[in-house]
Amino acid sequence: MTPARDALQVKAMFDRIAPGYDRANTVLSFGMDRSWRRRAADAAALRPGGAALDVACGTGQLTLQLKDRVGAGGRTVGLDFSQRMLDLARAAHPVIEWVEGDATNLPFEDSSFDAATTAFGLRNLADPEMGLTEMRRVVRRGGHLVVLEFLRPPGGLVGRAYELYLRLALPRLGGWVAGDRDAYRYLSDTVDTYMNGAQLLELAAGSGWGDTRLVPLNLGTVALMSGVATG
């Protein structure tokens, strides 16, 4: 498949699973995804009245956390390429600004935000490095990047157990909860072949982010990565 075709198929897949997406996330993470998103929002270091961008926002679960931190006087934008996801987000949280767009070509001026975040969306981009570069472009100097993402299975017993979960359990559970086993098989494959923590940090640094740090969560299967817009 060509990259363009690939992107269209991924978009169609997220449109299909949108109605059951939040429920599936909760079930598949054993309820931990909510606390991960709270930690990600805290790491964005936002202040009341600030401006936050959530890239690949889905139905807006992290976006809402950002909104709580900037308050009524701030600006919160959620961007996604799935119109179905955005329809659900807009219906649930109409006070937030929802934008359909491409994470690798953000429709915002330079230095528009105090922080940019993305939760479990970076690995679905056709060009993750360009996505991080674009996030750097739209964040003001001194602002923050926060990436919440699954990592390639680590070594040892935990890694083997995690790999079995990805290959065998996740597609079946996803099919049961969201009604689309093929979609969750794709998501399982993207995790199994994704970067490790060191590679993720290197990618962020190469995209213009400084002071990059990674906090492993859930026995090293999830990364909370942060960076600062320097230079």
Spell out what each predicted region is.
Residues 51-105:
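Class I SAM-dependent methyltransferase SAM/SAH-binding core
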Residues 114-128:
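A short SAM/SAH-binding and catalytic strip from SAM-dependent methyltransferases
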